[in-house]
Amino acid sequence: MTDFFDKLIEQEPYTQYTLDMFSRSAGKDHAEIQQFDKWRQMVTGANKYTFEVPHLGAQRPEISVRRESGDEYNLISFSSYNYLGYSYHPEVVDAAKKALDHYGLGATGSPLLNGTFQIHKELEDRIVEFFGQKDYGVSLFSSGYGANLGVISAFIHKGDHVVLDRSSHASLIDGAILSQGKISLFRHNDTEFLEKVLKRIDYENTRILVCCEGIYSTDGDYGNLRDIIDVSHKYGAAVLVDEAHSLLVAGENGRGVCEEQDVLSEADMIIATFSKSFGGVGGCIYANKKITNYMNYYARSRMFSCALDPGVTGGLIKSIKLA
């Protein structure tokens, strides 16, 4: 199978229709934009542009799509993270409709000012009940990406340290960059390497945040959370676990890899994403109430973004009840 994919990648038609997704400035003439535009015109002209293909219905295992040529295809989808099918579950959709009828289309405001509705508080309560820990709270964000961006940049500041697994999701990396903290990387799931990194930091006199994931979106494997948390706490570092791909599907009660590896009470912050198993959109941090209250006020991606729309919020509450 490996030989098959190696040969496929070597074929000129394959390489011709792909392009590096890491954009780099080419100077004042914007050459990189011109290069991309030329490439996109070439692949769309050949009907080979495979990104942003519109779906003609719900995100089900079997989907219908329309290419830019206008041709329609019925396909089996292997790309969705609608793991439990909640995005089109009739009870979830009905709950979203009822919330939409009652609250309207959008929150039309920042959650810190005028965008928090009672249904948002109900979702927060349901999440706390779902995890079942005393003195914990939830801070809601309009996306999982925004949650990582806001939480890391609110917790870490210039002079502090963020330590990331090399396989970290882009939102963790971007949050670390935005924080202006010092960034260090450790080899994927390698706690011996992590310890070497932490030893090099003046851990007694600086704040450290170690970020890892329950299930890594880049590799699809589980984070070695028990050892990562033990080593991190040994050096006084807080640990953020992104459970985006693992909530509702991992752990005896669906509480993620933290539950499965018995570290739920030891992770300092847990990030949840509502666009995967929950079937909606949005995200949150679940942590001690002191932390979540702080994030409500200081996480800029929350403060300066519109709150979750009420319809989606109603659907998310039903997803948790069904789980």
Regions found by a protein language model. Give the residues of each.
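Short, structured coil segments at secondary-structure junctions
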Residues: 179-180, 235, 266
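Conserved PLP-anchoring active-site segment centered on the Schiff-base-forming lysine
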Residues: 151-170
